[in-house]
């Protein structure tokens, strides 16, 4: 990661004349004459169909090719070849520059200043600039796109000059560069459905070449070098059922777990599975305001009784990685170690909180002359088979140990209402941790667990205001220690996502959160 202190420079407003998105090969030749020995000829659709050195991907639910607007996961994935982000996340959830060159953070952790590459061109030959970034972020902040939630804490974005953009947040954000993994569209891009894709990626959009096939041609003037693969075919299926059938017949060279459910689908043939640990956390939520659950030793005992290994291997089919803290196990700033090893048994922790196993069965205690029993309701979304199985497994473990637990499967809307109003004992939850690993949204003021700790709040704020790598590692380690001693809730596992690729494709880089097809310009075919 590049980090250096930057001086923000005020610049006059640049008035940009919008150009047509149509592909003008003569214009393109002129713009790139100095960068290529032999300019690329734009082929007609009939010629495109004969390209041999190609890869085939699938697509369905086409609504628009605008990568910020589409609601189709397959379209988003196809457009990864055409559009690029400022940064991408590697397998360690570490931001790596793509269109960005480097960046710096303000002392208060609220402003990121990003320097951009100066050798990037759009597929129509225009130069890439900070004004494109400003436009893309403006569209996202307007609420029009599927990325609006990602930048909900942004208060301002401005192009300081042609190669520098500054973005300010309403609170300190740790590892802020990790937020800028969305595709950048050109300044003035049509936000309507029928826009023609013009990106900066290794492959340019050539159009529809048959009834259900689109073509992406390699962009010979790509700043990363000429891609070895000539093109990408995008075969359109009428619906998901046909898409899955085509996957089953091996019609596609690439697909992902976002569109293919690996719980029910087994890839045929010699398909390579490229996994990464996502930021989606599955956990047992605990209502800390409940008298029976207010003691941290009670929560520690419950945590010890959960068989995370079984849940991960047998219920989630090893497509998850178990965890003890709400930080991605692959995260480059956290090594996952604990400062102290818990040597007490679950029974030992329960006894510290005055729980005893009565002859009648189950744990009880007497406080202020009143007898309490440790009997819990575990609510779960009945629409998720996985979560239902996890709930049943946890309830079985608790009941066997003497913690009386009843599972209550609820309709999704009813489940959400109970969680948001904090009307529950324990629950099976799911939360997508931001790529920044900023857990303030999960554990901040008013959190759904009724958990409050001044020490934890201070740690979270310090993490947000720190940019030094070694200092961040220390703070994340402190966070891990504090979390595992308090156990406001029980993290169970982070799910994994997967890119499935044909063995004929070489030089594939491990996918990362938010971008499956990383560095496709380096791919080769056997």
Regions found by a protein language model. Name each.
Residues 57-105, 138, 198:
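N-terminal lobe/hinge region of extracytoplasmic solute-binding protein
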Residues 101-144, 292-294:
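Aromatic- and charge-enriched surface segment that lines or borders ligand/interaction sites
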Residues 305-335, 386-395, 419-526:
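Detector for C-terminal structural segments
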Residues 294-395, 478:
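Append "and occasionally in soluble cytosolic enzymes with long acidic Gly/Pro-rich linkers
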Residues 59-79, 99-100, 126, 176-183, ...:
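A structural "hinge/loop" feature
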């Amino acid at each position: 990661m590049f980090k250096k202190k930057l001086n923000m420079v005020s610049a006059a407003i640049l008035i940009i004349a919008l150009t047509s998105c149509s592909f003008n090969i003569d214009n393109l030749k002129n713009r790139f004459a100095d960068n290529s020995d032999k300019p690329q000829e734009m082929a007609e659709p009939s010629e495109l169909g004969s390209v041999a050195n190609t890869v085939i991907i699938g697509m369905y639910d086409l609504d628009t090719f605008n990568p910020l607007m589409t609601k189709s996961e397959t379209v988003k994935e196809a457009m990864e070849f055409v559009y690029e982000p400022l940064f991408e996340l590697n397998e360690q959830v570490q931001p790596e520059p793509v269109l960005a060159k480097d960046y710096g953070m303000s002392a208060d952790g609220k402003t990121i200043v990003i320097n951009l590459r100066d050798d990037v061109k759009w597929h129509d030959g225009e130069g890439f600039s900070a004004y494109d970034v400003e436009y893309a972020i403006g569209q996202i902040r307007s609420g029009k796109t599927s990325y609006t939630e990602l930048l909900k804490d942004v208060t301002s974005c401005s192009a300081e000059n042609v190669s520098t953009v500054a973005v300010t947040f309403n609170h300190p954000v740790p590892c802020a560069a990790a937020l800028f993994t969305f595709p950048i569209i050109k300044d003035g891009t049509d936000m309507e459905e029928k826009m023609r894709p013009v990106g900066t990626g290794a492959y340019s959009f050539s159009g529809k070449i048959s009834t259900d096939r689109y073509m992406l041609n390699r962009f010979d003037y790509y700043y990363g070098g000429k891609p070895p693969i000539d093109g990408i075919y995008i075969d359109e299926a009428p619906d998901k059922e046909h898409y899955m059938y085509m996957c089953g017949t091996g019609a596609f060279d690439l697909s992902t777990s976002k569109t293919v459910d690996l719980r029910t689908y087994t890839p045929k043939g010699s398909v390579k599975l490229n996994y990464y640990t996502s930021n989606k956390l599955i956990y047992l939520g605990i209502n800390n305001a409940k008298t029976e659950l207010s003691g941290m030793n009670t929560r520690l005992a419950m945590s010890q009784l959960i068989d995370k290994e079984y849940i991960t291997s047998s219920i989630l089919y090893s497509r998850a990685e178990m965890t003890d803290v709400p930080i991605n196990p692959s995260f480059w700033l956290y090594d996952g170690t604990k400062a102290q090893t818990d040597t007490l048994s679950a029974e030992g922790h329960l006894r510290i909180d005055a729980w005893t196993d009565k002859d009648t069965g189950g744990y009880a205690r007497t406080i202020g002359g009143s007898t309490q029993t440790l009997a819990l309701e575990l609510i779960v979304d009945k629409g998720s088979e996985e979560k239902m199985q996890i709930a049943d497994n946890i309830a079985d473990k608790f009941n066997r140990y003497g913690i009386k637990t009843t599972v209550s499967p609820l309709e999704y809307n009813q489940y959400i209402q109970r969680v948001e109003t904090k009307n529950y004992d324990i629950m099976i939850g799911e939360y997508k941790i931001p790529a920044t690993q900023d857990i303030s949204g999960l554990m901040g003021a008013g959190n759904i667990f009724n958990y409050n700790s001044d020490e934890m709040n201070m740690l979270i704020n310090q993490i947000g205001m720190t940019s030094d790598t070694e200092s961040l590692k220390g703070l994340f380690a402190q966070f891990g220690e504090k979390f595992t001693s308090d156990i406001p809730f029980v993290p169970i596992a982070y799910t994994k996502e997967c890119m499935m690729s044909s063995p004929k494709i070489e030089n594939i880089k491990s996918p990362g959160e938010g971008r499956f097809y990383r560095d496709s310009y380096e791919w080769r075919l056997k």
